[in-house]
Structure formats: structure tokens, C-alpha cells
Amino acid sequence: MSKHIAGPEIERLIQLLARIPGLGPRSARRAALHLIKKKETLLEPLGAAIQAAVQKVCICSVCGNVDTIDPCSICTDPRRDDATIIVVEDIADLWALERAKTLAARYHVLGGKLSPLDGIGPDELNIAPLIQRVVQNPITEIILAVNATVEGQTTAHYITDQLSNFSVKVTRLAHGVPVGGELDYLDDGTLAAALQARTNL
């Protein structure tokens, strides 16, 4: 009995889908079958969209975001606050902040976080280009929107130290109780951060 249940093209589709984060082999098979069943309405448009992305998507040379133009749509948006840069670890973090629609600032994607154990030092991240942006532009505030992990906080402290000689305000996202969160369900570290970052009413 053959170990393959379909032709090599379908097997290849399943293998590639299984490499997407959150999709294992079983989910990939289901997704592939769904795409094949909806060939004209889903598989073909998806293939065309992927092909267009391969040809047009690029990394913004200013902030590190992905877009189909360089500089990206955010960097060229005249409605943005040029004096404020939000620093994020990854493009996914940038997109998350954009969904919040709270602050129309500029961004800077580091491309990761400092992690000596993994061999990731300052030279492996986009820290030098961030400093260069501060040197070349009238930046008044850097918002460090890094994750509340040991590596994220180490990265934040390193960047703060690198910016200490510039007349720029460095802030970070508040840590603590999430909206709708109940104290009884929060971990000790989150509660401690919330107490330290308490505000007046």
C-alpha cells in the first residue's frame, strides 16, 4: 500500500502548510483539502495573492516594517507624529499596536531581543539604525514597546543606556493589570508591576 494518499503536488502543499506556525500535519491536511475543494474561489486566489506577495513585499528601509512600498505606508503617512518613535521587537508587535489605534507615531522594528544565550547581541538587532534616526531627526520621545520578559527588559535597558546622551525622553509601556482582569487570577510579577506603576485618580 502506498504511503502517499495524494499526488506529489498535494503532498508538497500539505508539507508547506504544516510549516506555518499553529498548523501541525493534521491541520495542514484539513486546510489543504479545504483549499482543493474550493479551487476556484479560494485556492487560485490564494495562489495569486502569494505570488503577488513574493514579487512585491519588501522590508521598509526606515523602520523595518513589511509593505509593498519602501519606505512603507506608515513611514510616508504625513498624519503621523514624526517626533515619536515606538520601538518594537517584531513586526507582529507593530501590527498589534496599530490595531489598538491609540497613537499615530512612527515605528522601529528591532528584529528580536537581546539574548546572549542564543547568540543575539546588539549587532544582531536594528539598534544602531535606531540611534541613527535619533541623530538625524528631531525625535523627542522613544517609546519602548518591548515584551515584559527578561530579554525584553534587558533590551529596553540597553537601548535606554545607548540613548542617555541624547535629549530624548525614553518611556516604556505600562505593565500590570489588563483591562477586564481580576486580581485573583494574576501572577505575582504582574501584580508587583501594577503596584509599582500605580497612577493617581
From Swiss-Prot:
GO terms for molecular function: DNA binding; zinc ion binding. GO terms for biological process: DNA recombination; DNA repair. A zinc finger (C4-type) spans 60-75. The keyword Zinc-finger applies. Residues 83-178 form the Toprim domain. Keywords: DNA damage, DNA recombination, DNA repair, Metal-binding, Zinc, Zinc-finger. PROSITE patterns: RECR, TOPRIM. HAMAP family: RecR (MF_00017). May play a role in DNA repair. It seems to be involved in an RecBC-independent recombinational process of DNA repair. It may act with RecF and RecO. Belongs to the RecR family. NCBIfam families: recR (TIGR00615). This is Recombination protein RecR. It comes from Bartonella henselae (strain ATCC 49882 / DSM 28221 / CCUG 30454 / Houston 1) (Rochalimaea henselae).
